[in-house]
Amino acid sequence: MAHKKGLGSSKNGRDSNAQRLGVKAFGGQVVTGGSIIVRQRGTRLKPGQNVGRGSDDTLFALIDGKVKFVDRGRMGRFVAVEPVEAAQ
């Protein structure tokens, strides 16, 4: 006879860390070159003018300017950065 109670094991009790995806700079917001605009899996949003795409599909600004989101129907949704005039 066992003198100690057998301890059960659970197959639960794990959780992965959040990936922190989503839009990091919203429409109309001023960004600097190199700053991340959108973190995404796949190309839900496509790079437009003055926007680059990283190997993990992250969209980032290539120049300083204002973020603009454009829906072009069947072509998809694009993110662009419009340069801000130095006079402002």
From Swiss-Prot:
SUPFAM superfamilies: Ribosomal L27 protein-like (SSF110324). Disulfide bonds: none annotated. Transmembrane segments: none annotated. Keywords: Ribonucleoprotein, Ribosomal protein. One of its GO terms (molecular function) is structural constituent of ribosome. InterPro entries: Ribosomal_bL27 (IPR001684), Ribosomal_bL27_CS (IPR018261). The keyword Ribosomal protein applies. The keyword Ubl conjugation does not apply. GO terms for biological process: translation. GO terms for cellular component: cytosolic large ribosomal subunit. HAMAP family: Ribosomal_bL27. NCBIfam families: L27. Belongs to the bacterial ribosomal protein bL27 family. This is Large ribosomal subunit protein bL27. It comes from Acidobacterium capsulatum (strain ATCC 51196 / DSM 11244 / BCRC 80197 / JCM 7670 / NBRC 15755 / NCIMB 13165 / 161).
